[in-house]
Structure formats: C-alpha cells, structure tokens
Amino acid sequence: MRKKAAGGAERRPLKPRTEAAAAAPAGRAMPSDHSRMKLRRDCSRPSLQWYTRAQNKMRRPNLLLKDILKCTLLLFGVWILFYILKLNHTTEECDMKRMPYMDPDRIKRAQQYAQQVLQKECRPQFAKRSMAQLFGSRYSLDLPPFVTKVPAESEAEYKYDPPFGFRKFSGKVQTLLELLPEHDFPEHLRAKSCKHCVVIGSGGILHGLEMGHALNQFDVVIRLNNAPVEGYSEHVGNKTTIRMTYPEGAPLSDLEYYSSDLFVTVLFKSVDFNWLQAMVKNETLPFWVRLFFWKQVAEKIPLQPKQFRILNPVIIKETAFDILQYSEPQSRFWGRDKNVPTIGVIAVVLATHLCDEVSLAGFSYALNQPRTPLHYFDNLCMAAMNFQTMHNVTTETNFLLKLVREGVVRDLSGGIHSEF
C-alpha cells in the first residue's frame, strides 16, 4: 500500500539493493563493491609510463656522478703513470757509474777540515745559545727532544695534528709510552759534559769524499731514513747513535740496525702509531693497516723496546712555523701545503737541542744541476726533487746557509757552503 508524503505526493518504498541490481537493464550490470575498490586503486596508481620517466630522471644524477668519478680516477692514474715514467727516466740519467770526477785535492781538504772541527775545543751550550741569539723567541731553549710523558690536553703538543702535534691521539701516545721503558737521551751521553754531533744527510755529495773515519769520531752521529751504512762506510762511516725516520723511511735491511742505536720515530699520520706499536712489540702489522702507507714499510725492527724514542712533535712545529715561518696547516681536499720540513732539517734543529757543537755532512740541494746525484746510495737525480709536493727545499737551503755563515753549525762536505 502506498503512503502519501507531506504535501500529498506519493512516496514509494525503497527497494533492496539486490532488487535494484536485478532491475538493471540487461547487458548493463551494476558495478560491485569489489569492482569499485579496484577501480579506485587503479585511478590512484600512476601510469607505468610516468613511473618509467621518473625512474630515468633519478638515474641521470647517479650516472653523472659515476662518469665524474671515472674521469677523476683516469686523470689520477695518468698523473701517477707520468710521475713514475719521469722518475724512472731521471734514474737512468743518474747512474752512479756516471758520477762526476772527484778532485783528489778537494777530498783531502774536506778530510782535513773535518779533523780541524773535531780538534777544536767543545763549547758547552754553544748551539742552543747561538740559535736563541739568531732566532730570538722563535727558538725554545728548554724544549725536550723526545716525548717523555703524556702531555696535558692544554699543552702545545695537542694544538696541531701530526706531524706538528698529537691532537686527537692522546690515547695512542699513552699506549706507546707505556711500551717504552726509556724516554730520554741515554745516560752515558747525557753525562758527557760537552758533545760534538754530526747530522749525516743522504746527499750524493758524500760519495767519494772518504770521510767515514772522521765521521766515526763524533760523539753523536745522527743518520736519516734508510740511508745505508753497509757498502758505504768508507764515505759515511759506520757509527750510528740515532736513526731518525718515519715508517716509510725506515731501513728494510736488518744490517742497518745496531744494538746501540736509538730509533727516533717521526709520526705523520694515524697508522704510524699502529706501525710503531707493532715494531716495539715485535708483532706483525695487519695487512689492512699496510694499505695506508704509500710505500713498503719494514716488517720488523731488530731493536729492543728501550731503544725506541718518539720525536717531540713541537720540534717539528718549531722548525716549520717559528724558524722557517711556514704557514700553519689548512684543511684541503687534496695534497698538502709545502709546510712540512724534511727529516734532515728537523734533525738539524733536534741536534741543537741535544748537542753542544753541531756539524753537517751530506746536505746539498743543487736544483740548478738536475743531473747531479740526489743520494749517495741510489740512482735518483736532483731533478726528482721538482716532483715532490711536501717540502720547500729552497727555503730550507737558505736556512742552512744562514746557520753555516753565522757559525752556528759547520758544513763538513761543503754542499751548503764550503769553508775549505
């Protein structure tokens, strides 16, 4: 029965949904709930074509970065190859068999001059006082040569990163010092009232001078890096008091180490601490640590723990920033500023803190003579120095020249300034 709505209009009763579906015309089925939900999902999903385009756009930056990386690696490889080829070319030109003729008269004068230096009266504290007079407050009179204790965080040792300081490495320094039973200069050398010292460089100028006998007579003989004694003692002597080096520079041959040597280590980077710890403990350095060195390093150092020392990094800082007045280190994406002194110049400054009288032998950077032998023991030419990017050898030569001319040190081989 039909009911009338307000206003007199008829109101038909609602049919159930199933009936409505049945009343739909044939061939035109009403969408079900499942179909409507599927349709809604399909409408909200991006088309496959749009998705592919978006994915391709995301890939483009990645491909660009990969191309840039490939080009960078290629350029770096070409640079390394060029450096190696150039270095090998220089090596071939400076075979020791082609050494320039050594004037016998000059050899005799050099030997006589060395004997004269040794025979002169030793003047206590002369090197220190002369350096202080020459450089004023830029040279410290009371700077300890070796690390003897873990410095306080506020001390100068922690102002810079290695090699100028030990910032962020206090734990590693403490570990190393606990392994070393002795930290100072040996007692028998400290007890000597006045010491004559000689720093023997690696310069080719030593070859043929036959100064070995004279060099052996100095109280303290400081040798650098892997400069050999075996096979060259006639020219460079065979006495060694200090072997001063860094991991990559340490001699690989056991024959270059003597039971009385002090092995003074210069620490440049984090893995250098690991290497020194392994050497002191007579352990094998892990392979993954070796990957961080730029050349092969010694696997063992045949010395006792009491013979190892750590160079005070403030001596390097004093040499670089105060005396040579290099700029302080700046963070760079690649390479270094030329603000790291050579081991040789650092050793000269160290000698003024250790010794009363200081002499040099085997120092010479004749950059205007590119075919002059660089070392007394290998085939490298002086031209090889033009490819290194860490040291300013011109500034260092001027510094050594100043020391020799002012009488602070004496040049026994005449490579910096000849006085014979």
Swiss-Prot record:
Lineage of the species this protein comes from:
Eukaryota, Metazoa, Chordata, Craniata, Vertebrata
Compartment(s) = Golgi apparatus membrane
Segments on the Cytoplasmic side according to the record's topology features: 1-67
Q: Which GO terms describe its molecular function?
A: lactosylceramide alpha-2,3-sialyltransferase activity
Entry EC number(s): 2.4.3.9
What protein family is recorded?
Belongs to the glycosyltransferase 29 family.
**Bilayer-crossing regions:** 68-88
Provide this UniProt record's keywords sorted from A to Z.
Disulfide bond, Glycoprotein, Glycosyltransferase, Golgi apparatus, Lipid metabolism, Membrane, Signal-anchor, Transferase, Transmembrane, Transmembrane helix
Organism of provenance: Bos taurus (Bovine)
* Any single Gene Ontology cellular-component annotation: Golgi membrane
CDD domains named among the record's database cross-references: GT29_ST3GAL5
- Which segments sit on the Lumenal face? 89-420
Which Pfam families does the UniProt record give?
Glyco_transf_29
UniProt name for this protein: Lactosylceramide alpha-2,3-sialyltransferase
Tell me if Heme is a UniProt keyword of this record: no
The Basic and acidic residues compositionally biased stretches are 9-18
